[in-house]
Amino acid sequence: MLNIGCHLSSSKGFKNMGENALKIGANTFQFFTRNPRGSKAKDIDENDVKEFLELAKENKFCKILAHAPYTLNACSADERNREFAIEIMADDLKRMEYIPNNLYNFHPGSHVKQGTEVGIEYISSALNSILKKDQTTKVLLETMSGKGTEVGRNFEEIAEIIKRVELKEHVGVCLDTCHIHDAGYDIVNELDEVLEEFDSMIGLDKLYAIHLNDSKNPFESHKDRHETIGNGYIGLDALTNIINHPKLCHLPFFLETPNELEGYKREIELLKSAYKK
């Protein structure tokens, strides 16, 4: 079975997201934990959560993926911004325990000319501050395109962050196809080699989710602009190879393409028809 979903609005709660996922043929979904700008999160509706968990179990959902606000920067040059990122992520992880054993994804951040080493140290320190031994949520570092001073533009940087985390069992990676293509990893022509490099640097056992996106920009452009499936520089054939790859096919895939629900439904149908497992 292809485990696939897309990014959904959380404005009407978990059950509504689950119902919308089912309407488009998905068995998982991604959502923002709060407004993308990082404002106060809505109170948890425990009855809504209970109904969602029942729906998810009944329909055999795989793990869902929470996404931290884009504006968080755990390696900012401004100490207040770093503290804010830690505060929000810690609160998010506390709230995630209402839906245990799922995934939480965040962008590592930008070092803003402090240097990559400083950025890596701040990010790993932030993770060491927020991770708890008894948490059930896996925290995922997202691979980035290398725009500006982003940290996480290559596998080495992700690996170094994880190396410095004390509770390594609670961290992993979310691989974004658009990002790594734009960062210079040739997933179109050399997918096996890219996965071998990931495995040697980080370990495929640390890969827990994939953002499945096409790219509006050419290879190694460091731009990060997502395109609908099959209409970008990555292309349908390469994305089909990814969902069918024996080292990846068991993972949950999350679409973040520029789409509404009907567009996501068409993409999910297209990818399901191309899935061979």
Curated annotation (Swiss-Prot):
Catalytic activity, EC: 3.1.21.2
Listed cofactors: Zn(2+)
Record-listed Zn(2+) 2 binding positions: 142, 176, 211, 256
Known catalytic reactions: Endonucleolytic cleavage to 5'-phosphooligonucleotide end-products
Record's keyword annotation contains rRNA-binding: no
Cross-referenced Gene3D superfamilies: Divalent-metal-dependent TIM barrel enzymes (3.20.20.150)
Pfam families cross-referenced by the UniProt entry: AP_endonuc_2
Gene Ontology BP annotations: base-excision repair
Top EC group: hydrolase
Binding site for Zn(2+) 3: 179, 224, 226
Record note on cofactor: Binds 3 Zn(2+) ions.
Entry GO MF terms: deoxyribonuclease IV (phage-T4-induced) activity; DNA binding; DNA-(apurinic or apyrimidinic site) endonuclease activity; phosphoric diester hydrolase activity; zinc ion binding
Record keywords: DNA damage, DNA repair, Endonuclease, Hydrolase, Metal-binding, Nuclease, Zinc
Binding positions (Zn(2+) 1): 67, 107, 142
Superkingdom of origin organism: Bacteria
Entry's family note: Belongs to the AP endonuclease 2 family.
Biological function: Endonuclease IV plays a role in DNA repair. It cleaves phosphodiester bonds at apurinic or apyrimidinic (AP) sites, generating a 3'-hydroxyl group and a 5'-terminal sugar phosphate.
Protein name as catalogued: Probable endonuclease 4
